[in-house]
Amino acid sequence: MIVVTGGAGFIGSNLVKQLNAQGRTDVVVIDDLTDGTKFVNLVDLTIADYMDKDEFQARIVSGDEFEEWDGGIEVIFHEGACSATTEWNGKFIMEVNYEYSKDLFHYCIEREIPFIYASSAATYGGRNDNFIEDPKFEQPLNVYGYSKQLFDQYVRRWMPEINSQVVGLKYFNVYGPREQHKGSMASVAFHLNTQVKKGENPKLFEGCDGFPNGGQMRDFIYVDDVCKVNLWFWLNPQHSGIFNCGTGRAEPFQNVAEAVIKHHQKGAIEYIPFPDHLKGRYQSFTQADMTKLRGVGYDAEFKTVAEGVADYMAWLNR
């Protein structure tokens, strides 16, 4: 069985979709459906089983071999996390993101099960250069980023002793289908689309930290491309480590808004004041250094913002 934690969430459900497209339906989704709206991400997917995240963790900790799943666990894609960068309950974040990840990690390395997990570019904090997979470049701005940084450090410490595949992927700004449940944490493309559909103009922040209006730049990566990187590592088990998962391109928010306007054929960008509560806690620029990922042989192209947002708009407004 293929286990996808966070499988009803944004990236997890897209990963299940790609697995289905490859003919794999022996997939177990682990999630927390307290937010019942997430079920819509699973409706059009074929899975073999569903299990609540707490039950799964309890069985992992007890050393359960999941004999009811034919052949046990083949691989764990660990996408489940509290991904709200605005969540400041550190105890909750550390339990869900750090302790849970450690439990899965030890279960996998003891049994030599491939473990591919979601890290985050939030580990880099507010820097404007050197987004390189090295602890000296990591300085997160929020407790979410810290929980991801700490787990990366934990994995790095164990790496020399591990005999099976362990891969951490530092996701940059991911956008695309199946993120509607994320509310304020959904991508800029999602929110701009909602604004235009309501008859409003798409709104971007005014300039701040030396960036012009709408000119803050991020490495925006389409969710399909993120899933392809995950699946490539699973098919190339000789590679382990922590890798950036971006495009290597920084594009301004302006490009996202223009792609949304182009799809709808209406609207003009409106600039709003930069919120005080985000000053000093906001990544104004991100750009993945792709040297390490390209160095292990990943050579697929990544969609530009214009290409990815066009695809996404077609899906959202279908």
Swiss-Prot record:
> Which UniProt keywords are present, listed alphabetically?
Carbohydrate metabolism, Isomerase, NADP
> Per the record's keyword annotation, is Isomerase included, yes or no?
yes
Question: What InterPro entries does the database record attribute to this sequence?
Answer: Epimerase_deHydtase, Heptose_epim, NAD(P)-bd_dom_sf
Q: Which reaction does it catalyse?
A: ADP-D-glycero-beta-D-manno-heptose = ADP-L-glycero-beta-D-manno-heptose
Q: Name one GO biological process term.
A: ADP-L-glycero-beta-D-manno-heptose biosynthetic process
Q: Which residues form the active site?
A: 144 (proton acceptor), 182 (proton acceptor)
Free-text note on domains in this protein's UniProt record? Contains a large N-terminal NADP-binding domain, and a smaller C-terminal substrate-binding domain.
Please give the name of this protein.
Answer: ADP-L-glycero-D-manno-heptose-6-epimerase
